[in-house]
Amino acid sequence: MYKIIGKFYDEDIERECATPDYAIGVFMAQIQRGMQYTDNYTASDAIDEAIDVSRGVYTNDLPHFHQLTDDMWLELRKE
């Protein structure tokens, strides 16, 4: 089981995911959402992050922490 926790301004994020692929999808959706609020974050950054996350998932190099701003962050864990 994989778990994604995080903060999106006032919203707390917590999702459980059965497979790595689903976890990566949820993670990327939140990053893409964050891109709308962060001027200096690009699609290229999101792609690089997806590669890093997937590498972490498949090599069990977790937890993986990602922070867009002080108010937006995500962490992917294996439980």
Regions found by a protein language model. Give the residues of each.
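Hydrophobic beta-strand residues in large extracellular and virion-surface proteins
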Residues: 2-4, 15-17, 23, 74-76
